[in-house]
Amino acid sequence: QMCIRDRHWDSLPGTWLKPEIGKQRIMRDPSIVATPNGVFHLVWTTSWRGDLGFGYAHSTDLVNWSEEKFIPVMKHDTTTVNVWAPELFYDDCNNELMIVWASCIPGKFERGIEDENNNHRLYYTKTKDFTTFTPTKLLFDPGFSVIDAVITKRAEKDYVMVLKDNTRPNRNLKISFAQQPEGPWSPASQAFTESFVEGPTVVQIDPNYLID
Protein backbone atom coordinates (compact mmCIF):
# COMPACT_ATOMS: atom_id res chain seq x y z
CA GLN A 1 0.00 0.00 0.00
CA MET A 2 1.04 3.59 -0.63
CA CYS A 3 -0.11 6.98 0.65
CA ILE A 4 0.64 10.48 -0.61
CA ARG A 5 1.22 13.70 1.31
CA ASP A 6 2.60 16.93 -0.07
CA ARG A 7 3.15 15.18 -3.41
CA HIS A 8 5.41 12.59 -1.79
CA TRP A 9 4.58 8.89 -1.82
CA ASP A 10 5.29 6.67 1.19
CA SER A 11 4.81 2.95 1.66
CA LEU A 12 2.50 1.67 4.39
CA PRO A 13 3.28 -1.48 6.37
CA GLY A 14 1.09 -4.53 6.56
CA THR A 15 -1.57 -6.20 4.46
CA TRP A 16 -5.05 -4.71 4.67
CA LEU A 17 -6.90 -6.93 2.24
CA LYS A 18 -5.63 -10.42 1.45
CA PRO A 19 -7.43 -12.20 -1.40
CA GLU A 20 -9.27 -15.22 -0.03
CA ILE A 21 -11.72 -16.09 -2.81
CA GLY A 22 -11.51 -17.63 -6.26
CA LYS A 23 -9.70 -20.75 -7.41
CA GLN A 24 -6.27 -19.12 -7.41
CA ARG A 25 -6.96 -16.53 -4.70
CA ILE A 26 -5.09 -13.76 -6.46
CA MET A 27 -5.87 -10.05 -6.65
CA ARG A 28 -5.17 -8.64 -10.11
CA ASP A 29 -6.60 -5.67 -11.99
CA PRO A 30 -8.12 -3.91 -8.94
CA SER A 31 -10.69 -1.21 -9.68
CA ILE A 32 -12.00 1.10 -6.96
CA VAL A 33 -14.73 3.75 -7.04
CA ALA A 34 -16.25 5.91 -4.29
CA THR A 35 -20.02 6.47 -4.35
CA PRO A 36 -21.72 9.64 -3.02
CA ASN A 37 -22.53 7.94 0.30
CA GLY A 38 -18.82 7.73 1.12
CA VAL A 39 -18.37 4.02 0.45
CA PHE A 40 -15.40 2.73 -1.56
CA HIS A 41 -16.20 -0.26 -3.76
CA LEU A 42 -13.41 -2.58 -4.95
CA VAL A 43 -13.50 -5.35 -7.57
CA TRP A 44 -10.66 -7.53 -8.86
CA THR A 45 -9.67 -10.56 -10.93
CA THR A 46 -9.54 -13.69 -8.77
CA SER A 47 -7.93 -16.19 -11.18
CA TRP A 48 -6.20 -16.31 -14.52
CA ARG A 49 -8.61 -18.99 -15.74
CA GLY A 50 -11.39 -21.13 -14.36
CA ASP A 51 -13.44 -18.60 -12.38
CA LEU A 52 -16.88 -17.45 -13.53
CA GLY A 53 -16.82 -14.19 -11.57
CA PHE A 54 -14.74 -11.58 -9.77
CA GLY A 55 -13.99 -10.48 -6.21
CA TYR A 56 -15.71 -7.65 -4.33
CA ALA A 57 -15.22 -5.80 -1.04
CA HIS A 58 -16.15 -2.36 0.31
CA SER A 59 -14.78 0.10 2.85
CA THR A 60 -15.42 3.57 4.26
CA ASP A 61 -11.79 4.36 5.05
CA LEU A 62 -9.67 2.21 2.67
CA VAL A 63 -8.16 0.50 5.72
CA ASN A 64 -10.92 -1.65 7.16
CA TRP A 65 -12.62 -3.80 4.55
CA SER A 66 -15.77 -5.87 4.45
CA GLU A 67 -15.83 -9.61 4.03
CA GLU A 68 -14.88 -10.54 0.48
CA LYS A 69 -17.61 -11.74 -1.89
CA PHE A 70 -17.36 -13.69 -5.11
CA ILE A 71 -19.71 -12.31 -7.79
CA PRO A 72 -20.42 -15.12 -10.34
CA VAL A 73 -21.40 -12.93 -13.29
CA MET A 74 -20.76 -15.64 -15.91
CA LYS A 75 -22.38 -18.57 -14.11
CA HIS A 76 -24.98 -18.74 -16.89
CA ASP A 77 -22.32 -20.10 -19.28
CA THR A 78 -19.99 -22.63 -17.71
CA THR A 79 -17.86 -22.80 -20.87
CA THR A 80 -16.51 -19.33 -20.01
CA VAL A 81 -12.72 -19.47 -19.77
CA ASN A 82 -12.15 -16.45 -17.53
CA VAL A 83 -13.39 -13.18 -16.06
CA TRP A 84 -10.67 -10.57 -16.41
CA ALA A 85 -10.14 -6.98 -15.32
CA PRO A 86 -13.52 -5.99 -13.86
CA GLU A 87 -13.82 -2.21 -14.03
CA LEU A 88 -16.23 -0.04 -12.04
CA PHE A 89 -18.12 2.91 -13.48
CA TYR A 90 -20.49 5.01 -11.38
CA ASP A 91 -23.61 5.90 -13.37
CA ASP A 92 -24.70 9.18 -11.79
CA CYS A 93 -27.87 9.34 -13.90
CA ASN A 94 -29.25 6.16 -12.32
CA ASN A 95 -27.27 6.15 -9.06
CA GLU A 96 -25.86 2.69 -9.70
CA LEU A 97 -22.56 1.01 -10.42
CA MET A 98 -21.76 -0.62 -13.72
CA ILE A 99 -19.11 -3.35 -13.83
CA VAL A 100 -17.40 -4.10 -17.15
CA TRP A 101 -15.08 -7.06 -17.71
CA ALA A 102 -13.61 -9.25 -20.44
CA SER A 103 -14.50 -12.92 -20.86
CA CYS A 104 -13.71 -15.58 -23.42
CA ILE A 105 -16.41 -18.05 -24.49
CA PRO A 106 -14.88 -20.50 -27.01
CA GLY A 107 -16.69 -20.62 -30.34
CA LYS A 108 -19.05 -17.72 -29.63
CA PHE A 109 -17.39 -15.09 -31.85
CA GLU A 110 -15.25 -14.93 -34.98
CA ARG A 111 -11.84 -16.08 -33.86
CA GLY A 112 -9.54 -14.00 -36.05
CA ILE A 113 -5.89 -14.74 -35.37
CA GLU A 114 -6.37 -15.52 -31.68
CA ASP A 115 -7.09 -19.02 -30.42
CA GLU A 116 -10.48 -19.77 -28.90
CA ASN A 117 -9.19 -19.41 -25.34
CA ASN A 118 -7.99 -15.87 -25.95
CA ASN A 119 -10.88 -14.44 -27.97
CA HIS A 120 -12.35 -12.00 -25.43
CA ARG A 121 -15.37 -9.71 -25.58
CA LEU A 122 -16.65 -7.14 -23.10
CA TYR A 123 -19.62 -7.81 -20.82
CA TYR A 124 -21.38 -5.83 -18.10
CA THR A 125 -23.84 -5.88 -15.22
CA LYS A 126 -25.25 -3.09 -13.01
CA THR A 127 -26.06 -2.94 -9.31
CA LYS A 128 -27.08 -0.52 -6.58
CA ASP A 129 -26.06 -2.66 -3.61
CA PHE A 130 -23.80 -5.53 -4.77
CA THR A 131 -26.55 -7.90 -3.72
CA THR A 132 -28.90 -7.66 -6.68
CA PHE A 133 -27.48 -7.46 -10.21
CA THR A 134 -28.95 -6.94 -13.65
CA PRO A 135 -28.55 -9.90 -16.03
CA THR A 136 -25.11 -10.09 -17.63
CA LYS A 137 -25.11 -8.64 -21.15
CA LEU A 138 -22.63 -8.25 -23.99
CA LEU A 139 -21.31 -4.68 -23.96
CA PHE A 140 -18.95 -4.54 -26.94
CA ASP A 141 -17.93 -6.83 -29.78
CA PRO A 142 -15.41 -4.87 -31.87
CA GLY A 143 -14.61 -7.85 -34.09
CA PHE A 144 -11.36 -8.67 -32.30
CA SER A 145 -10.22 -9.86 -28.88
CA VAL A 146 -10.66 -6.98 -26.44
CA ILE A 147 -9.84 -6.56 -22.72
CA ASP A 148 -9.08 -3.85 -20.13
CA ALA A 149 -11.96 -1.45 -20.80
CA VAL A 150 -12.50 1.72 -18.78
CA ILE A 151 -15.46 4.09 -19.23
CA THR A 152 -15.51 7.81 -18.49
CA LYS A 153 -18.26 10.40 -18.86
CA ARG A 154 -17.36 13.67 -20.59
CA ALA A 155 -20.85 15.23 -20.58
CA GLU A 156 -24.50 14.28 -20.78
CA LYS A 157 -24.93 11.63 -23.48
CA ASP A 158 -21.17 11.66 -24.12
CA TYR A 159 -19.28 8.60 -22.91
CA VAL A 160 -15.82 7.39 -23.88
CA MET A 161 -14.40 3.89 -23.49
CA VAL A 162 -10.68 3.22 -23.63
CA LEU A 163 -9.91 -0.42 -24.41
CA LYS A 164 -7.10 -2.77 -25.30
CA ASP A 165 -6.99 -4.54 -28.66
CA ASN A 166 -5.66 -7.86 -27.40
CA THR A 167 -4.86 -9.40 -30.79
CA ARG A 168 -1.31 -10.15 -31.82
CA PRO A 169 0.77 -8.26 -32.69
CA ASN A 170 -1.32 -5.16 -31.89
CA ARG A 171 -1.75 -5.24 -28.09
CA ASN A 172 -2.50 -1.50 -28.09
CA LEU A 173 -5.14 0.97 -26.89
CA LYS A 174 -8.14 2.24 -28.84
CA ILE A 175 -11.24 4.36 -28.13
CA SER A 176 -14.98 3.98 -28.63
CA PHE A 177 -17.87 6.43 -28.04
CA ALA A 178 -21.50 6.14 -26.93
CA GLN A 179 -24.44 8.25 -25.75
CA GLN A 180 -25.05 6.02 -22.74
CA PRO A 181 -22.77 3.64 -20.83
CA GLU A 182 -24.66 0.54 -21.99
CA GLY A 183 -24.05 1.52 -25.62
CA PRO A 184 -24.39 1.03 -28.47
CA TRP A 185 -20.70 1.80 -28.81
CA SER A 186 -19.07 3.10 -31.96
CA PRO A 187 -16.50 1.03 -33.87
CA ALA A 188 -13.10 1.11 -32.20
CA SER A 189 -10.74 3.86 -33.32
CA GLN A 190 -7.29 3.43 -34.73
CA ALA A 191 -4.67 2.70 -32.09
CA PHE A 192 -3.29 5.75 -30.30
CA THR A 193 -0.45 3.91 -28.52
CA GLU A 194 2.41 1.67 -29.48
CA SER A 195 2.09 -2.09 -29.09
CA PHE A 196 2.20 -3.95 -25.78
CA VAL A 197 0.18 -1.44 -23.76
CA GLU A 198 -2.63 -2.43 -21.40
CA GLY A 199 -4.58 -1.58 -18.25
CA PRO A 200 -5.47 2.06 -19.04
CA THR A 201 -6.50 4.57 -16.38
CA VAL A 202 -8.29 7.79 -17.35
CA VAL A 203 -8.04 10.94 -15.21
CA GLN A 204 -9.54 14.34 -16.02
CA ILE A 205 -7.39 17.38 -15.35
CA ASP A 206 -9.42 20.22 -16.82
CA PRO A 207 -9.75 20.63 -19.68
CA ASN A 208 -7.73 17.56 -20.64
CA TYR A 209 -7.90 13.84 -20.00
CA LEU A 210 -4.78 11.89 -19.11
CA ILE A 211 -4.57 8.22 -20.08
CA ASP A 212 -1.97 6.22 -18.21
Language-model regions, residue ranges each:
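Carbohydrate-active catalytic/glycan-binding domains of CAZyme proteins
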Residues: 1, 5-212
